[in-house]
A protein has these predicted regions:
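C-terminal structured domain segments
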Residues: 264-307
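Short, surface-exposed loop/turn segments at secondary-structure junctions
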Residues: 104-108, 259, 286
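Protruding loop/beta-arch "assembly-hinge" segments enriched in small, turn-prone residues
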Residues: 1-34, 290-330
Length: 330
């Protein structure tokens, strides 16, 4: 941060540790898990992307057999591409009257309470940005489910098996490595007859017949049948009402969608210039600054402010490497 900013809003290491520290429901947040993080030295730059078609047989249509003394066949090629990125600044603050700090009868520091409160706002907003990107009908290939997964006649395993083939073919023969569900769709899987009828073992024991499966058992079934290693459930909820209005909560990750695609394997290399080289993936997380926190007093010394701030960007990279399935829950 610039020195002038630090003088006005000094970073407090204790409060920074508090905003990073997890609260009990933070395990529902998946934004930091689903993307490959790319730590960049500058807020903006260029990512240079390899063209995967260059490795799909750029010599197609050529006769590679060479007669003695003749020239070798020259294969074709596809230009590599580039995109620009710019990490954005995200920040939030809250304040408390000095008198309330002095008069507080609650256990613990009021500043620490504000730090946790502000951090939760920041983390939920980050989760929302991730969900808005990966569940966006316009950022990736999209199709509608043949039936909602909570329908009695639905066959979600068969649907997901076919979706994997669709992603595989669109990605030039690369298998999807990530599957993300909204919680409603995922919970419907545990009650679905096709999934409940699956016979197999999992970490918690043996599952078969008409037993309703635990979340861990459903994930194990999906990994076993689909061969997709990274499976996540977006279960976080957020109050969507403005301050002063009646509380209205909703899921951050839409309950009637899922994402399947390639979010691993960028093998990104960050150059001194700030540019990034890598293989294409569906989306990346460009991280310029980790979340930090601090506190400062108003000029008239009547209020104390606590803030949190981070600099990052979730960015779609290749629309063909991800697929959004809609209509998965009624």
């Amino acid at each position: 941060m610039a020195s002038s900013y630090s003088n006005l809003h000094p970073v407090d290491q204790i409060l920074t540790n508090l905003v990073i520290e997890a609260v009990p429901s933070d395990d529902q947040l998946i934004a930091d898990k689903v993307f490959e993080p790319i730590v960049v030295p500058e807020r903006s730059g260029t990512i240079l992307l390899e063209e995967t078609r260059n490795f799909m047989g750029a010599g197609a249509g050529l006769d590679l057999e060479r007669a003695p003394g003749s020239s070798r066949a020259t294969i074709g090629g596809f230009d590599r591409t580039s995109q620009t990125f710019k990490a954005k600044i995200y920040a939030a603050s809250d304040s408390i009257a000095m008198e309330d700090i002095f008069d507080s009868q609650y256990p613990g520091s009021e500043e620490q309470r504000l730090a946790r409160k502000v951090a939760r706002v920041m983390k939920l907003a980050k989760e929302k940005r991730a969900a808005d990107l990966l569940f966006d009908d316009t950022s990736f290939n999209t199709s509608a489910a043949s039936a909602t997964f909570d329908a009695t006649t639905a066959e979600p395993l068969s649907e997901l098996h076919q979706l994997k083939d669709t992603v595989f073919e669109a990605a030039h023969g690369i298998n999807p490595d990530t599957l993300i569900f909204g919680r409603k769709t995922f919970r419907a899987l545990a009650r679905n007859p096709e999934v409940r009828g699956y016979v197999g073992t999992h970490a918690q024991g043996f599952a078969s017949g008409n037993l309703i499966l635990s979340d861990e058992a459903v994930i194990e079934v999906l990994r076993s049948v689909l061969g997709i290693p990274n499976i996540y459930v977006g279960a976080a909820r957020q109050d969507t009402a403005v301050p002063g209005a009646t509380s209205s909560e909703g899921y951050i990750w839409s309950g009637d969608k899922l994402f399947m695609g390639i979010l691993r394997g960028a093998d990104a290399i960050v150059q001194k210039s700030g540019n990034v080289k890598g293989m294409p993936v569906a989306a990346l997380n460009f991280q310029f600054g980790n979340m930090v926190a601090g506190q400062y007093d108003s000029l008239d010394k009547t209020r104390r402010y606590v803030y949190a701030e981070e600099v990052s960007q979730y960015k779609a990279i290749d629309s063909t490497l991800g697929h959004v399935l809609t209509g998965t829950h009624s």
